């Protein structure tokens, strides 16, 4: 039986999100899967299906030893190694560095002699970064550098682990007694609100997140709960964790409605049972969202602040995301939102309509995205609200570029999605990108020429460095050359030649590869032009209508 260890020293939401990969690995058959997490995440890890063993690191104990002056640093390291002994003394067929951070990379490197293969980043014997999978480069060097990431983390993790996604299988463990209690209580709430034979939908509202930057503003919550309570079709219930802070927040909102809002309190063990019985979860970016994805509960994420929904949004076919327009999102800090209570309720009612032909009318600078799947996995497409066509075209074409460069295939539905923006807009955008590529190719050829001349003339080295720096600036651009340039930059940092000649040869190879990759973009732009020429109407996304409450 194959033995797999997943190192996941990330946050609680990432532990739950890893269940997608764990389920896919288990679907391959005859595999024993273990995970390494921080001790505070052990309860979440133990709730995941298909886990044989959960190993933990007590980081608080290690931090105490490291920070207390009466102990030597050696004591902290000794404690860490003691906690790692059971893992190191086993043989693993595959170790997956799910963390892809410094600590996870060190630990993956520490046990590399105990495994036949490491998926993800690790350090070699000379303490140099090693990457044995091009998708790891995508994860670490491209997705992290692009605010509008073209690929979801879940899909990238599957590629890193060389595992196809499996849509079949249970991902989280639930307790039958807890399931029955939750079903009975929530059904009682439904019956109590039933009028004229209409069975109302129970909508769970998650209040708090791990960061105040992502929390739903209390006034926004009050506004959309007020509107929900006016509708005979909706029953809002507040979801909280069992702690005094969240209780006080929930009580404040409930008191605003004369205690007329149901509050459901659940811990990590009972949360899956509660979510399984809801008709919809309205939530900011939380671990609760990831649990809902595992239970099959529909999710409407209200994405605010630092929430990176394009790469860590809800992972399910029926997911919706309500956000301020992408060009107004900073993803780096707090920002006032244009989302209103009416936007939320209109979107909720849209979710429960069968045909989805009438789109909700949203406030200015607010966009509603829906989840779709293609050959790369999940992505989000605007279905209503304010849309910047150039931003959407660039975002989708970057996804197309990733597909071509990393898996040598085009995604036909992306061309169809871009067609919705209108022929003239697409044509002008493509012309501008071709102009950008022309300038990029000039800089690339200048860099290549300086490199070759530098082999014969040492005084040309400064010219090469200057040209290379100019070329690498494209890695910070918002142009289509960004993805291939980031890929080039990532590979450049991995060059390990021992002589100037070896390094020069490797750089030359990478420059020619970069040139080839950019030429592929020109082919994609030509295909886009041909597809856009078939468009007869303008932007279908703006065809919206108001949903009455």
What is each residue range found by the language model?
Residues 1-549:
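Catalytic machinery of carbohydrate-active enzymes
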């Amino acid at each position: 039986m194959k033995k797999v260890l997943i190192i996941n020293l990330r946050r609680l939401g990432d532990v739950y999100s890893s269940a997608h990969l764990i389920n896919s690995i288990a679907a391959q058959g005859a595999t024993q899967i273990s995970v390494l997490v921080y001790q505070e995440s052990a309860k979440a890890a133990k709730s995941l299906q298909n886990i044989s063993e959960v190993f933990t690191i007590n980081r608080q104990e290690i931090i105490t030893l490291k920070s207390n002056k009466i102990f030597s640093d050696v004591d902290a390291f000794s404690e860490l190694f003691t906690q790692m002994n059971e893992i190191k003394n086993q043989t693993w067929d595959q170790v997956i560095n799910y963390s892809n951070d410094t600590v996870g990379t060190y630990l993956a490197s520490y046990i590399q002699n105990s495994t036949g293969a490491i998926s993800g980043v690790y350090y070699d014997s000379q303490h140099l970064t090693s990457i044995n999978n091009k998708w790891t480069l995508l994860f670490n060097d491209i997705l992290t550098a692009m605010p509008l990431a073209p690929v979801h983390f879940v899909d990238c993790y599957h590629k890193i682990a060389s595992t196809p996604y499996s849509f079949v299988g249970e991902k989280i463990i639930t307790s039958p007694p807890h399931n029955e209690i939750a079903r009975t209580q929530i059904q009682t709430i439904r019956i109590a609100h039933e009028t004229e034979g209409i069975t109302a939908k129970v909508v769970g509202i998650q209040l708090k997140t791990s960061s105040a930057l992502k929390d739903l503003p209390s006034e926004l919550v009050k506004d959309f709960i007020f509107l929900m309570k006016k509708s005979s079709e909706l029953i809002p219930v507040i979801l909280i964790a069992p702690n005094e802070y969240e209780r006080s927040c929930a009580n404040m909102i409930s008191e605003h409605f004369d205690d007329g809002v149901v509050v459901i309190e659940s811990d990590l063990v009972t949360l899956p049972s509660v979510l399984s019985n809801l008709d919809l979860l309205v939530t900011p970016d939380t671990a609760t969202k990831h649990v809902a994805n595992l239970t099959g509960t529909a999710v409407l994420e209200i994405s605010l602040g630092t929430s990176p929904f394009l790469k860590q949004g809800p992972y399910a076919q029926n997911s919706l995301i309500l956000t301020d327009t992408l060009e107004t999102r900073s993803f780096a800090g707090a920002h006032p939102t244009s989302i209103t209570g009416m936007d939320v309720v209109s979107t909720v009612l849209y979710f429960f309509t069968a045909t989805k032909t009438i789109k909700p009318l949203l406030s200015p600078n607010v966009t509603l995205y829906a989840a779709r799947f293609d050959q790369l996995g999940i992505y989000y497409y605007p279905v209503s609200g304010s849309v910047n066509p150039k931003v959407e075209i660039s975002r989708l074409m970057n996804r197309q570029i990733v597909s071509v460069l990393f898996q040598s295939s085009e995604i036909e539905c992306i061309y169809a999605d871009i067609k919705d923006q209108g022929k003239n807009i697409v044509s002008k955008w493509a012309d501008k990108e071709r102009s950008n590529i022309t300038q990029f190719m000039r800089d690339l050829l200048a860099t290549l020429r300086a490199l070759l001349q530098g082999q014969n003339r040492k005084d040309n080295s400064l010219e090469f460095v200057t040209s290379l720096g100019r070329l690498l600036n494209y890695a910070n651009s918002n142009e289509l050359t960004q993805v291939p340039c980031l890929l080039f930059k990532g590979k450049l940092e991995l060059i390990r030649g021992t002589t100037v000649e070896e390094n020069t040869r490797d750089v030359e190879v990478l420059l020619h590869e970069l040139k080839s990759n950019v030429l592929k973009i020109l082919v994609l732009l030509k295909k886009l032009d041909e597809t856009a020429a078939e468009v007869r109407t303008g932007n279908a996304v703006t065809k919206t209508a108001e949903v009455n409450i």
